[in-house]
């Protein structure tokens, strides 16, 4: 993916950069593969904010992505590469020989016209989806299942990639992009290669309005609030937080305290925790 940088014509274009979308095909999304999406704006079913700093933004049409890749009967041909407003990775339409059409995540290096395969008999090639038991150690993979048949849940963001480190008995050891080493059943499916749009994290929005287009609202510091709104709030003029350690808006310890349950069921599958930032 190529990135275009702006000159400082206005304060908003200073340091701003956008994707040139050179890989994108000039096609509208397939209507039968899309759904109308109602924005929740960070609210739950009672209208209470459960995820702050969300709301507004451009209207979006949701594209139904095939994370299962369970069409084992026929090879598929990449028909288009498209932009998806609901994720930072690109997506592509696959036309299968049996007449089926599906959206999948775009693997890096795949072009329009390339063939992809799924199933136990598929070759070890970029974009093919194969059970972990058939993939050699050292192979780079993405869109990894946690439960066989449930569909890919791990390593789906733009530019991410995992690596198979070892295989023994029923389990494969996978190194995730975070640095975590995790055991995953060898019956789970994974896609060969890296997710496309690898330069997505190098784009600079440049102005506040660009973030509002994405549906992200401003983040206000706790010390700038009133004491009724945040534990850090209140005081005369610029004051410190007035506490021994930083707190969340709900009074829990912030910045460094572990929030993961000590007895979570998946702890036994994690061989090495992710790296500290």
Curated annotation (Swiss-Prot):
Q: Which UniProt keywords apply?
A: Chloroplast, Plastid, Ribonucleoprotein, Ribosomal protein
| Entries under HAMAP family matching the protein | Ribosomal_uL2_B
Top-level taxonomic group: Eukaryota
Annotated region Disordered: the residues are: 36-56, 225-259
Question: What cellular component terms from Gene Ontology apply here?
Answer: chloroplast; mitochondrial large ribosomal subunit
Q: Name the Gene Ontology biological process terms.
A: mitochondrial translation
- The protein's name: Large ribosomal subunit protein uL2c
Q: Which family does it belong to?
A: Belongs to the universal ribosomal protein uL2 family.
Keyword flag Transport: no
Q: Which GO terms describe its molecular function?
A: rRNA binding; structural constituent of ribosome; transferase activity
Gene it is expressed from:
rpl2
Source organism of this protein record: Psilotum nudum (Whisk fern)
Q: Write out the annotated subcellular location.
A: Plastid, Chloroplast
Q: How does it assemble?
A: Part of the 50S ribosomal subunit.
InterPro entries noted in UniProt: NA-bd_OB-fold, Rib_uL2_dom2, Ribosomal_uL2, Ribosomal_uL2_bac/org-type, Ribosomal_uL2_C, Ribosomal_uL2_dom3, Ribosomal_uL2_RNA-bd_dom, Translation_prot_SH3-like_sf
């Amino acid at each position: 993916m190529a990135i275009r940088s702006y000159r400082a014509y206005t304060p908003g274009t200073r340091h701003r950069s956008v994707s040139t979308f050179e890989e994108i095909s000039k096609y509208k999304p397939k209507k039968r593969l899309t759904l109308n999406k109602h924005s929740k704006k960070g609210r739950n079913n009672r209208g209470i904010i459960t995820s702050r700093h969300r709301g507004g933004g451009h209207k979006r049409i949701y594209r139904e992505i095939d994370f299962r890749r369970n069409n084992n009967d026929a090879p598929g041909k990449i028909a288009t590469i498209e932009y998806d407003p609901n994720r930072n990775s690109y997506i592509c339409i696959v036309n299968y020989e049996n007449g089926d059409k599906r959206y999948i995540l775009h693997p890096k290096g795949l072009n329009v016209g390339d063939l992809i395969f799924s199933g136990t008999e598929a070759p070890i090639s970029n974009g093919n989806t194969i059970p972990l038991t058939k993939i050699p150690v050292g192979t780079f993979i993405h869109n990894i299942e946690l439960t066989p048949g449930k569909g890919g849940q791990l390593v789906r963001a733009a530019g991410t990639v995992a690596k198979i480190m070892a295989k023994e008995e029923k389990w494969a050891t996978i190194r995730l992009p975070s640095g975590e080493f995790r055991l995953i059943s060898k019956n789970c499916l994974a896609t060969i290669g890296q997710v496309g749009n690898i330069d997505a994290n190098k784009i600079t929005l440049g102005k506040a309005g660009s973030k509002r287009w994405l549906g992200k609202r401003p983040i206000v510091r706790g010390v700038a609030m009133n004491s009724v709104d945040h534990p850090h709030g209140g005081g005369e003029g610029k004051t410190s937080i007035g506490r021994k350690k930083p707190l969340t808006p709900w009074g829990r310890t912030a910045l460094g305290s572990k929030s993961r349950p000590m007895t979570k069921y998946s702890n036994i599958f994690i061989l090495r925790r992710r790296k500290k930032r």
